[in-house]
Curated annotation (Swiss-Prot):
Keyword NADP in record: yes
Family stated for the protein in its record: Belongs to the MMACHC family.
Pfam family, one: MMACHC
Cofactors demanded by this protein: FAD; FMN
InterPro entries, per database record: MMACHC (IPR032037)
Enzyme Commission numbers on file: 1.16.1.-
Gene Ontology MF annotations: cobalamin binding; cyanocobalamin reductase (cyanide-eliminating) (NADP+) activity; demethylase activity; FAD binding; glutathione binding; oxidoreductase activity
Main location (coarse class): cytoplasm
Origin superkingdom: Eukaryota
Cited function: Catalyzes the reductive dealkylation of cyanocobalamin to cob(II)alamin, using FAD or FMN as cofactor and NADPH as cosubstrate. Can also catalyze the glutathione-dependent reductive demethylation of methylcobalamin, and, with much lower efficiency, the glutathione-dependent reductive demethylation of adenosylcobalamin. Under anaerobic conditions cob(I)alamin is the first product; it is highly reactive and is converted to aquocob(II)alamin in the presence of oxygen. Binds cyanocobalamin, adenosylcobalamin, methylcobalamin and other, related vitamin B12 derivatives.
Cofactor note: Can utilize both FAD and FMN.
Protein species of origin: Caenorhabditis elegans
Protein name, as recorded: MMACHC-like protein
Localisation: Cytoplasm
Gene: cblc-1
Length: 272
């Protein structure tokens, strides 16, 4: 059983080489015990690993779409022979792209550490419950501050106001990155059952909103008007999604491929 931090750091180096910051990725190390403590040891979201087990959170930044994903779309068009053929064969482009990149990373990683599990932001149990709470991972790992509504109540005031959410919808929290604000996404968590890092201390997440009133405004924007993406700009992030990326995610799934057609038909001059 491996206990050395040096091995954990070598694992992270491999991940960072294959999912580089230049191509729009970040990795953040944390202990499973820190996550389980945050969600509650008896919670259905707690993970069945030793407290000192190593985990890595993978998130994407604006460059993932505009650099790595763009290259992937162009390469797929070449492989399939036409952009229309790619559209026909690949129904979930971002998910397919990420699966390809994670498989390439995994092949390299197995040379350093054979035993690991990957949980995605879309990984569900048979009961349709998330296998892991990504926003909690992000806060625990110090990647992004997780603003939870229960921590920003105001004495004598009922908040959030009742009746504004749709049926069966819950008023939920929001994670904001210290550089990208809401212009990022949690993607996956890698868990290494045989790698123990008992002495590792996670960094504290840095808040970009400090006034409770600002936090409540951001949470209301996120919960009530998330489709306009205005919540992403709270905290004045220094990097944002491009116009193309915003349009892509703002379209219905069936219409998203058309946003990307200029990448192969019109050349770079038509892309942000």
């Amino acid at each position: 059983m491996v206990t050395e931090m040096s091995h954990a750091e070598s694992i992270k180096r491999v991940v960072d080489q294959k999912l580089s910051s230049h191509e729009g990725f970040e990795s953040h190390m944390f202990k499973i015990g820190s996550y389980n403590e945050a969600v509650g040891e008896s919670s259905p979201f707690a993970l069945p690993y030793d407290d000192s087990t190593m985990a890595l959170l993978i998130l994407s930044t604006p460059d993932m779409f505009d650099v790595a994903f763009r290259k992937w779309v162009v390469q797929k068009t070449m492989d399939f022979g036409s952009f229309d053929e790619v559209c026909e064969m690949v129904s979930s482009p971002i998910q397919s792209f990420l699966e390809d990149r994670l498989e390439i990373m995994s092949e390299k990683l197995r040379k350093v550490e054979e035993n690991f599990e990957i949980l995605h932001d879309y990984s569900m149990t048979p009961q349709r419950r998330p296998k892991i709470l990504m926003q909690t991972c992000g806060h625990v790992a110090g990647a992004a501050f997780y603003y939870q509504p229960c921590h920003f109540q105001e004495d004598g005031v009922t908040w959030p106001p009742a009746g504004r959410m749709g049926p069966n919808l819950k008023f939920i929290g929001l994670s904001l990155h210290p550089i990208y604000g809401g212009h990022f996404a949690f993607r996956s968590v890698l868990i290494f059952p045989n790698v123990k890092i008992p002495e590792f201390c996670e960094k504290e997440p840095r808040p970009i909103l400090t006034a409770s009133e600002d936090v409540r405004t951001a949470l209301e924007k996120f919960n009530y008007n998330w489709k306009d993406s205005g919540f992403r700009d709270f905290g004045n992030p220094t990097r944002r999604y491009s116009t193309t990326q915003m349009e892509f995610f703002g379209r219905p799934v069936a219409e998203r491929w058309e946003v990307l057609r200029p990448w192969v038909d019109g050349g770079a001059k038509n892309i942000d």
